[in-house]
């Protein structure tokens, strides 16, 4: 939805406002800011639009928007959090693009995330080359800090922002076991107690530069559907990504270094929030299509591990 301001009251230099651009999650922000950088590049939007963001976001999410020097960020008061209440700006805007509650938009559940954001910003996705639909905006705007880890490690990311997409402990342990055959492993999850040598538990990153450094220095990222997949693309790091709730092409279609694995389940495709404990159980069962036999996991992992070991 777009709001147009009164022509007589609008100065020639009136800015563009974007409400809730681009949500509260780190991954959504990385992809949404790529769409915004493209919209500015092709002239669909003027330079430095104003992003109205809800308060009390995590430090890492705030850091992503601070890095995006092509936009200004302001606070969106909670009483304007949903589109049930028309936005009342304190100053004239050329137009206001309303992305409030986009997580509940049916189109968001059934299309590539980058395409969704581009269309919201007035850009036809098909007019943009695949190379511009990748997360190219970020790498030049951060200074990755190398982690305290051996060189050539494999980074495992089992946790997502939603428990619905978390990697089960048994899957995490199996991936760790196989990855240790190749070299040192850094995991963001709980380090299984049976693995000691060459296994490092990554403490939560204290800055965006540290998080980017953790990804940038990895030779391979193995992750569930989370922001780490988008960061791996931003730094051209090979990635093996698992998708228990979304079609992979809705997330990583344009990522040339990402091998995506779809995990079919009886959940509605594109579900964003668990409706109850049974949904979490359905998501978990998608990781075990053959019961306790994890041969399917070996078949997708081993070729990637062999390739990164060369």
Residue ranges and their predicted role:
Residues 1-310:
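Catalytic machinery of carbohydrate-active enzymes
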């Amino acid at each position: 939805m777009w709001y147009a301001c009164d022509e007589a009251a609008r100065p020639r230099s009136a800015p563009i406002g974007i409400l809730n651009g681009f949500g509260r999650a780190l991954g959504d922000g990385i992809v949404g800011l790529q769409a915004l950088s493209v919209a500015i590049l092709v002239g669909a939007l003027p330079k430095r639009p104003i992003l109205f963001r809800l308060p009390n976001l995590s430090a890492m999410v705030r850091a992503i928007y601070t890095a995006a020097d092509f936009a200004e960020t302001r606070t969106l008061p909670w009483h304007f959090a949903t589109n049930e209440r028309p936005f009342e700006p304190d100053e004239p805007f050329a137009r206001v693009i309303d992305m409030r509650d986009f997580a509940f938009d049916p189109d968001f559940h059934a299309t590539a995330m980058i395409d969704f954001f581009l269309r919201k910003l007035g850009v036809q996705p098909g007019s943009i080359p695949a190379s511009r639909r990748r997360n190219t905006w970020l790498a030049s705007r951060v200074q990755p800090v190398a982690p305290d880890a051996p060189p050539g490690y494999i980074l495992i990311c089992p946790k997502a922002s939603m428990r619905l997409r978390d990697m089960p402990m048994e899957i995490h342990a199996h991936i760790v076991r196989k990855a240790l055959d190749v070299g040192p492993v850094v995991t963001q999850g709980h380090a299984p107690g049976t693995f000691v040598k060459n296994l490092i538990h990554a403490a939560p990153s204290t800055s965006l530069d540290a998080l980017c450094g953790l990804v940038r220095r990895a030779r391979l990222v193995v992750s569930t559907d989370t922001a780490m997949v988008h960061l791996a693309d931003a730094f051209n790091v090979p990635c093996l990504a698992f998708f228990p709730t979304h079609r992979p092409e809705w997330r990583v279609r344009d990522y040339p270094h990402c091998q995506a694995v779809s995990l079919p389940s009886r959940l509605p495709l594109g579900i964003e929030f668990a409706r109850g404990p049974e949904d979490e159980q359905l998501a978990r069962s998608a990781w075990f299509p053959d019961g306790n036999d994890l041969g399917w996991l070996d078949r997708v992992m081993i070729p990637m591990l062999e390739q990164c070991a060369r």
